[in-house]
From Swiss-Prot:
Zn(2+) binds at H143, H147, H153. Its EC number is 3.1.-.-. Belongs to the endoribonuclease YbeY family. Coiled coil: none annotated. Binds 1 zinc ion. The gene is ybeY. One of its GO terms (molecular function) is zinc ion binding. Its main location: cytoplasm. GO terms for cellular component: cytoplasm. It comes from Rickettsia bellii (strain RML369-C). This is Endoribonuclease YbeY. Pfam families: YbeY.
Length: 183
């Protein structure tokens, strides 16, 4: 089970009724199902902030020391490393080491972390990239969940692995690769 708490701090998010707890749970479940490590965990928790340029700018400055609005920020609750994950039946190579869950407390429960989305940046990007707002949001949600479980894009190898996972998960929802449009 995935518990999702959503805080909407910006009225324009109300225009996107399709972005709701049910959608976020479905996307989160599909993303986590890519890894055998999470199959034993019975309950996940995820907090979502749907906000505006002003608040995301404040968060980006406070936590990343970048004075610029961004589309999404991810705040992992745990220090995980993607190289410790076991992929479920896809082609991406990784280690077969079990992820260490003992230090997370109750192994039946895992707080994934917090994600903050900026409506205006996502809206502008989706317009510029000729995507629907919802599809762009779904892509950013998958991207953010991968960050919460230890993925990053600090080098070309990590970037390619992360992008391939995103493309694979998006395809499950009938969404084309977002990287074909922006590269």
């Amino acid at each position: 089970m995935i518990n999702v708490e959503i805080i909407k701090n910006y009225s324009k998010w109300r225009e996107h009724k399709q972005i709701n707890k049910a959608l976020i749970k479905k996307i989160t479940q599909k993303t986590l199902s890519q890894f055998d490590n999470f199959s034993e965990i019975k309950q996940f928790e995820l907090s979502i902030l749907l906000t505006n340029n002003e608040e995301i700018l404040t968060l980006n400055k406070q936590f990343r020391n970048i004075e610029k609005a961004t589309n999404v920020l991810s705040f992992p609750a745990n220090e995980l490393n993607w190289q410790d994950l076991r992929f479920s039946g896809n082609e991406i190579a990784s280690s077969n080491k079990p992820i260490i869950l003992e230090n997370l407390g109750d192994s039946d429960y895992m707080h994934l972390g917090d994600i903050a989305f900026c409506h205006d940046v996502i809206y502008n990007e989706s317009y510029e990239q000729q995507k629907t707002f919802e599809n762009h949001f779904i892509h950013l949600l998958i991207h953010s969940i991968l960050h919460l479980i230890g993925f990053d894009h600090q080098n070309d190898t990590e970037t390619k692995i992360m992008e391939n996972l995103e493309i694979e998960i998006l395809a499950h929802f009938g969404i084309s690769s977002p990287y074909l449009l922006i590269k």
